[in-house]
């Protein structure tokens, strides 16, 4: 999953490979995401994850790394009967904007944001 939009509910680009290959959109939720591919949909239930957050006040660079688990279910169309589970790793890089005084600001929108989630585990259809 990849996004460059810092909004919490922004759709994410998703590419799946393995048992099937497809590209589509992930609609994130607090505990369950909905994945929409051209031939159907399914749900990804996920843990919040645990990890680290760091911010460098000199460079305005923030990093977040989280590891967690997920489970697939609720498939429709080509994904009816999908099941699977596994682990994920979330990486976020943020470059905070600087305010008029030249200090990093958490109130202004970031100048750059990148989120990448890599997941792996067995899947059955």
Q: Which residue ranges define each predicted feature?
A:
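Beta-strand-enriched cores of mature, soluble protein domains
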Residues: 1-125
């Amino acid at each position: 999953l990849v996004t460059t939009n810092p909004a919490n509910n922004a759709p994410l680009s998703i590419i799946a490979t393995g048992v099937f290959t497809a590209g589509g959109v992930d609609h994130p939720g607090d505990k369950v995401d909905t994945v929409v591919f051209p031939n159907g949909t399914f749900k990804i239930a996920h843990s919040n994850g645990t990890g680290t957050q760091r911010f460098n006040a000199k460079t305005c660079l923030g990093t977040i790394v989280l590891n967690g688990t997920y489970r697939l279910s609720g498939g429709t169309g080509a994904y009816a009967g999908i099941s699977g589970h596994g682990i994920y790793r979330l990486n976020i890089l943020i470059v905070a904007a600087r305010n008029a005084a030249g200090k990093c600001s958490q109130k202004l929108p970031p100048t750059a944001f990148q989120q990448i989630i890599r997941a792996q585990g067995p899947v059955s259809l």
